[in-house]
Amino acid sequence: MSKDDCIEFEGTVSETLPNTTFRIKLESGHEVTAHISGRMRKNYIRILTGDRVKIEMTAYDLTKGRIIYRMK
């Protein structure tokens, strides 16, 4: 699966879980778990509960995702 095949969503961080994993509440009302992308980890971008984030998910598993951007 190439990078272009990912689906992007926006949501709000509702809970912080261990190992830099977060529970995200999407705008549609669904809740998914997501981890931080490597580029965000490398640049020490902190994510807190209540932050608006953009996540990408594959079509194969719509319960897990990767946080790719933190909104200002």
Swiss-Prot record:
InterPro entries: NA-bd_OB-fold, RNA-binding_domain_S1_IF1, S1_domain, TIF_IF1. Transmembrane segments: none annotated. Keywords: Cytoplasm, Initiation factor, Protein biosynthesis, RNA-binding, rRNA-binding. It holds the Pfam family eIF-1a. It is found in: Cytoplasm. SMART domains: S1 (SM00316). Residues 1-72 form the S1-like domain. GO terms for molecular function: ribosome binding; rRNA binding; translation initiation factor activity. Gene3D superfamilies: Nucleic acid-binding proteins. GO terms for cellular component: cytosol. Component of the 30S ribosomal translation pre-initiation complex which assembles on the 30S ribosome in the order IF-2 and IF-3, IF-1 and N-formylmethionyl-tRNA(fMet); mRNA recruitment can occur at any time during PIC assembly. One of the essential components for the initiation of protein synthesis. Stabilizes the binding of IF-2 and IF-3 on the 30S subunit to which N-formylmethionyl-tRNA(fMet) subsequently binds. Helps modulate mRNA selection, yielding the 30S pre-initiation complex (PIC). Upon addition of the 50S ribosomal subunit IF-1, IF-2 and IF-3 are released leaving the mature 70S translation initiation complex. Belongs to the IF-1 family. This is Translation initiation factor IF-1. It comes from Xylella fastidiosa (strain Temecula1 / ATCC 700964). The lineage of its organism: Bacteria, Pseudomonadati, Pseudomonadota, Gammaproteobacteria, Lysobacterales. The gene is infA.
